[in-house]
């Protein structure tokens, strides 16, 4: 009776152990198996010399070296080693015979795992690989209709891309017989970029209401209708051009600007290199030589003295020697940089941190003499460059009885502006001059009360 009871208990223990460990192994097996029918694979974008290849246990193809292009050398293995071709490689290597070796299981410290190195039989402790995405907090991606989530290679967070199953693409016909290509995260093929430097274009003649336009990824221009300009809600500043300059409205803009009055300018016709014809821009008065294509010019490098440096003049391709500047009285900015040949001050690599311009709203100023507004590196807003007012002849406007002359800052010529309302303003008791447009005098001296 006792023997039957002991035997029954033994059977129960064996059954329980088989049930527990069998269920655990089955769970692990279920977790390790992936149903490739539920996986959507991108086409392997292999380069020249590579072929698509599917690794064991994976659903999608990756790229590996085309073994038909590889000439392998068969090594001679020493005793205890045998020839084996690793998965994903083309050539055989010598691998140790591990069937006759008994290995112990190492006890690894925290942060280390047991792993068998390549070419070895027994496991050793190696540092556990760090997952760079473990500490990255990714946003929840809610893709719109027609887009699907995907994780780009080498990135931690999921992004949205177009669902190519809902997109119908037309195969483009590329110029010069080029083959269309497709990026991994795009649905449609497109033409590769063309080297436009080697393309000779025929310039079409456009109508009066058309203009030349070069489409993206194309080399040659086409004619397209001019866009209609709507200036209904545009508020333009009053343009007051100085003597020798006239107002004009640039094509495609709503507001007037100032340009030089070409009837007062005498120009000399330049003689250009290589027999090229001088050209004139629409808003300029004088002709100038077109830019030279220096890509086909070979230059002889001149040997300069110690007090000279190489310099390439504007519009020229080849450098010449010119004297170094006198840097005795030069005032240079405080920055870290390198000094170019022929310069006194360094080209700043690092500039001190300026103001936070994200909180500043600036209006673009309209400068006199047609000058372009400039912006200093440590400032947020554009401003007009300083004008030499000594060389400017200003017409003095006639102001009304309730107006006075006023010269705005950074301007040379005065304008009329309304006089201020001085009722109720208490002025200090002093000796001074009352300027036009002011309520109180500018005090030269203040009387002192005697005790």
Swiss-Prot record:
Residues 1-22 form the signal peptide. It comes from Dictyostelium discoideum (Social amoeba). GO terms for cellular component: extracellular region. Keywords: Glycoprotein, Secreted, Signal. PANTHER family: TNFR-CYS DOMAIN-CONTAINING PROTEIN, TRANSMEMBRANE PROTEIN-RELATED. The keyword Secreted applies. This is Uncharacterized protein DDB_G0274171. It is found in: Secreted. It comes from the Eukaryota. The keyword Signal applies. Glycans are attached at residues 25, 45, 209, 326, 402. Its main location: secreted.
